[in-house]
Amino acid sequence: MTKTTLLHEGKAKKVFLTDQSDLVIQEFKDDATAFNNKKKGTIADKGVVNNAISCRLFTLLEEHGIRTHLVEKLSDRDMLCKRLDIIKVEVVVRNIAAGSLVKRYGFKEGFVLQEPLVEFYLKDDDLDDPLMNDFHAVALGVATSEELAILRSRAEAINLVLRQFFADRKLKLVDFKLEFGRHKNEILLGDEISPDTCRFWDLDTNEKMDKDRFRFDMGGVENAYSEVQKRVLELD
């Protein structure tokens, strides 16, 4: 399978068409951004690490009956995927208070939520990806009520699988972002699952092991990403 035309280039990945109309190649970049592209930089070998982690986690979810866009890992940076019609809803699942949840509602960082929170955000960089509810999403025409129910249910199921997986590897899954898309009349999980899209804290020390280290100039970004990769793959 080879790349043909560049279909889309985002902050962290490029997506290429292939000689099969329903398949694309997702190429992971080392570019790093934060605060909706206001901060930019690079993280050495981030693309390699995120591809490896994402492929492993998509495979894990498939094993638990959760359908994803993954077809196979092609190379260190390339993932062969089913082509999706992306739903313009970013789904965020929160287990522990951090980030914007702390700023918006005054939770103390690290507060363990009684139940996981599932939030919807409009996928629109120009509007800074605003928080929205089901009524907003339907009014905007980005998803139907039925689709939103599927996204919420799917996100909750993914959270159950991933929380246990990471706990077994001495990591707290604080929160994470998911993207979904339509493919041949079904909704599949797309994008990636990585330290770019998740908050990971060490189970014993609460050390942050994700893109917050880049966001807030904490240093040790590459080491944190590599350590997450090591833990994700170490029991395979």
Curated annotation (Swiss-Prot):
This protein's UniProt keywords: ATP-binding, Ligase, Nucleotide-binding, Purine biosynthesis
Keyword RNA-binding: no
Annotated S-S bridges: none
This protein's pathway: Purine metabolism; IMP biosynthesis via de novo pathway; 5-amino-1-(5-phospho-D-ribosyl)imidazole-4-carboxamide from 5-amino-1-(5-phospho-D-ribosyl)imidazole-4-carboxylate: step 1/2
A GO molecular-function annotation: phosphoribosylaminoimidazolesuccinocarboxamide synthase activity
InterPro entries listed in its UniProt record: SAICAR_synt/ADE2_N, SAICAR_synt_PurC, SAICAR_synth, SAICAR_synthetase, SAICAR_synthetase_CS
EC number: 6.3.2.6
UniProt-listed GO biological process terms: 'de novo' IMP biosynthetic process; cobalamin biosynthetic process
Keyword Repeat: no
Family, as annotated: Belongs to the SAICAR synthetase family.
Name listed for the protein in its UniProt record: Phosphoribosylaminoimidazole-succinocarboxamide synthase
Organism in which the protein naturally occurs: Chlorobium phaeobacteroides (strain DSM 266 / SMG 266 / 2430)
